[in-house]
Amino acid sequence: MNRRKALAFALAGFALATLAAAAAPPEPPGYRLDDYQSPTPDTFNGEPALSVEAAKAAWSDPKTIFIDVLPHPPRPEGLPKGTIWQEKPHAGIARSIWLPEVGRGALAPETEAYFSRSLSEITGGDKDAILVFYCKRACWMSWNAAKRAASMGYSQVRWYSDGIEGWREAGLPTETIAPRP
């Protein structure tokens, strides 16, 4: 009887692993244009997404640049004149730079120019700087932003797919960050 249970558990584990592997979609040829909070590929440019351990190792090198691409919530419309509105603090991976909105599938020309200019400024024009893009777990915006940076000629682009949630769960340092102007 114990053999049967062991075999059943082994088969169940194999089935779950197979289903989990099948759940990850392949890398698309272009950008994801909608449904950003959905299953993401396990890879970026054919390379595995950074694990928490790999992201932590990359972060330990102060030359590595972590970039948060989570959108910035706008000021609510229709607030009466003179209303004081205070933004909710945004926690990011410590030492990261927040470039909101740059992970959408289609960017307005102004947003694309902002992204290009920001990358040039934060890397000092070094197209070989190591860039790690993140957002939330299973968020296509960070994948899109990484793809866009690579298309701009940046050669050391990495994608951290577990995002801020994975970082926090690992007990790694975070800090309140503001959007880069």
Which sequence ranges carry the predicted segments?
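Rhodanese-like catalytic fold shared by cysteine-dependent sulfurtransferases
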Residues: 2, 9, 19-53, 58-61, ...
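Glycine-rich nucleotide phosphate-binding loop and flanking beta-alpha elements
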Residues: 73
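Sec-dependent N-terminal signal peptides
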Residues: 7-14
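Short hydrophobic beta-strand that contains or immediately precedes a catalytic carboxylate
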Residues: 55, 65-70
